[in-house]
C-alpha cells in the first residue's frame, strides 16, 4: 500500500513491533520506573479519538486485563485529573501523551498538570522513564522531556476516530497484552477485506450504509439508538457517535458542492 510515495506496510510493521516490544517489557516487569519499581498503572492522556477509542476497547475487553491498571484523562476538569492522580503512585505509573501535533490544547494542558504533579516526587531526568508519546511532532515531544526512543508514530493518514488500531492503541496493548491487541487488529483487517472484496449484495458495511440513507431520507427517521446489552460495551455508543457522525455528517461533498440530502443519522444511547 503506497501513500505519498511510501510503502506504509513497512512503517506499520515497524510500529507494531515497537508497540509489542514496549508493551511486553512493561507487562513482564523488565521496564522499571525511576525508583527501580515495576510499572503498576498506565494513564492515557488524550482527547477525541485519542481517548474515546482506546478507553472504549479497554473497558469492553476488561476480561482480558493484565495486572496493569489503565486510566484515561481527557477532560481539563481539575477534579477529574485529581481523582485519577489520587489513585496512582508516581514511582510506578506510566503516562502516555497522545496528540498528533503535540499542540492540542486540552491534551497538553492535562499533560503539563500531570508533569507538575510528577515532579513533586521526582526530578526532570526521571520524566523520560515515566512519560511516552504517540505523536508526529518529534521536536515538541522531546522538548517536553520525553525520550526519543519512547515516541510512537502517528501518521497524517490515520484519522483520529480510527486511531485505536494504530500506535494510539498502545494503552490497549498494555491493558490486555499485545497478543490480544493483535487479534483486534486482525479482526479489523478481516472486515476491511470483506468491505473491499465482497459484492454489494453481500457487503455488510454497504448494506448498513444503504439502510441508514433509506431510513433517514425516505422514512424521515433521524435518530439511531445504540443500546448495548453487555455492560462492558456501555461506552461503545459514545465511540460510535464520533466515528459515524464525524465521518458521515457532512454538508458538502468531495468537490465542495452542497449536499441536498441527509448524510447521517443522529446516534443516541441509553
Where are these regions (language model features)?
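Extended, charge-enriched "interface" segments that sit outside catalytic cores
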Residues: 1-34
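Glycine- and acidic
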Residues: 2-11, 39-43, 67-70, 91-103, ...
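N-terminal small/polar loop signature for handling phosphorylated ligands or for N-terminal nucleophile
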Residues: 18-29, 37, 78-91
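Short, well-ordered amphipathic alpha-helices
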Residues: 21-27, 55-60, 108-119, 242-248
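Anionic-ligand anchoring segments at beta-strand to alpha-helix junctions in alpha/beta enzyme folds, i.e.
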Residues: 41-91, 227, 232-266
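Acidic, glycine-rich active-site loops and adjacent beta-strand->loop/helix elements
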Residues: 49, 76-77, 100-103, 135-140, ...
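Extended, hydrophobic alpha-helical segments in both membrane/secreted and soluble proteins
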Residues: 53, 57, 81, 97-100, ...
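Active-site phosphate/pyrophosphate-binding segments
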Residues: 117-269
Amino acid at each position: 500500500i503506497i501513500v505519498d510515495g511510501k510503502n506504509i506496510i513497512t512503517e506499520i510493521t515497524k510500529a507494531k513491533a515497537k508497540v509489542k516490544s514496549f508493551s511486553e517489557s512493561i507487562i513482564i516487569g523488565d521496564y522499571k520506573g525511576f525508583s527501580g519499581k515495576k510499572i503498576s498503572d498506565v494513564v492515557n492522556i488524550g482527547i477525541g479519538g485519542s481517548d474515546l477509542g482506546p478507553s472504549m476497547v479497554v473497558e469492553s475487553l476488561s476480561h482480558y486485563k493484565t495486572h496493569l491498571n489503565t486510566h484515561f484523562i481527557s477532560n481539563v476538569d481539575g477534579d477529574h485529573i485529581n481523582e485519577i492522580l489520587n489513585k496512582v503512585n508516581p514511582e510506578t505509573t506510566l503516562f502516555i501523551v497522545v496528540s498528533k501535533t503535540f499542540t492540542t490544547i486540552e491534551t497538553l494542558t492535562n499533560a503539563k498538570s500531570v508533569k507538575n504533579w510528577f515532579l513533586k516526587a521526582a526530578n526532570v531526568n526521571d520524566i523520560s522513564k515515566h512519560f511516552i508519546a504517540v505523536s508526529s511532532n518529534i521536536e515538541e515531544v522531546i522538548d517536553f522531556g520525553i525520550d526519543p526512543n519512547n515516541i510512537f508514530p502517528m501518521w497524517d493518514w490515520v484519522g483520529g476516530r480510527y486511531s485505536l488500531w494504530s500506535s494510539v492503541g498502545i494503552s490497549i496493548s498494555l491493558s490486555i497484552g499485545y497478543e490480544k491487541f493483535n487479534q483486534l487488529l486482525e479482526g479489523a483487517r478481516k472486515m476491511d477485506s470483506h468491505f473491499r472484496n465482497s459484492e454489494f449484495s453481500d457487503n455488510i458495511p454497504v448494506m448498513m450504509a444503504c439502510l441508514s440513507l433509506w431510513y433517514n431520507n425516505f422514512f424521515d427517521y433521524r435518530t439511531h439508538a445504540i443500546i448495548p446489552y453487555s455492560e462492558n460495551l456501555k461506552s461503545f455508543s459514545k465511540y460510535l457517535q464520533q466515528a459515524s457522525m464525524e465521518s458521515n455528517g457532512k454538508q458538502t461533498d468531495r468537490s465542495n458542492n452542497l449536499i441536498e440530502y441527509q448524510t447521517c443519522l443522529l446516534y443516541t444511547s441509553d
